[in-house]
Structure formats: structure tokens, C-alpha cells
Amino acid sequence: MSNGPLAPGYDSDILVEDDVRLPRMYRVLLHNDDYTTMEFVVSILVEVFRKTAEQATAIMLAVHRDGVGECGVYTFEVAETKAAIVHARARREGYPLRCSTEEV
């Protein structure tokens, strides 16, 4: 007869933890160009990356000043999806805005 939730024959005093690994994380970067408007970049940051207007403006200015700015850090699938959404919206609006991902 079992004295706990474990199957018969198992010692309920010994618990084995599984090796839990966190997923690799990726940063999403926006790259500066001479054609995409600052307003469009801010709108992308607000709509796609859920930034506040103040955060979006700060990131947009970093992109403009430094040539690149970080939008956020996500799991691989989320980062790649957000980058694809940025590219699709930029192309639809006629902008050459580039977005990339890199492992943290």
C-alpha cells in the first residue's frame, strides 16, 4: 500500500527535480534609415511592442542617434514574429525600416 501520491514501490521521502531550463532570449532591434519617419517608428513601437509613448520616443531617438535601438527581449518565436510584423507593416506603408533579432 502506498503512503502518498507516488506509485507503490517508490519512496515518498525522495523527490527528484527535473532539470528545468529557461528558453534562450532574443533582443529585437530597429535600424535607422534615411526614409522611415520618426512618427512611423513610434507607432510601430507602441502598437507592436506595447511601449508607452514616452518609451517609444526614447527608443526612436536612440535609433536615430545611434543607428540602432532595442525594442525588447523575447523568446525566439515571439522575437521573430514581432520582427516579421514590423517588416510587413513597413513594406505596406512604403518604408525600408529594418528590424533584426539577436540572441542575448
From Swiss-Prot:
Database matches in InterPro entries: ClpS, ClpS_core, Ribosomal_bL12_C/ClpS-like
Protein origin, superkingdom: Bacteria
Gene Ontology biological process terms, A to Z: protein catabolic process; proteolysis
Gene3D superfamilies: 3.30.1390.10
Alphabetical list of Pfam families matching this protein: ClpS
Function recorded in the entry: Involved in the modulation of the specificity of the ClpAP-mediated ATP-dependent protein degradation.
Complex and partners: Binds to the N-terminal domain of the chaperone ClpA.
Assigned protein family: Belongs to the ClpS family.
Protein name in the entry: ATP-dependent Clp protease adapter protein ClpS
Species for this entry: Nitratidesulfovibrio vulgaris (strain ATCC 29579 / DSM 644 / CCUG 34227 / NCIMB 8303 / VKM B-1760 / Hildenborough)
Lineage: Bacteria, Pseudomonadati, Thermodesulfobacteriota, Desulfovibrionia, Desulfovibrionales
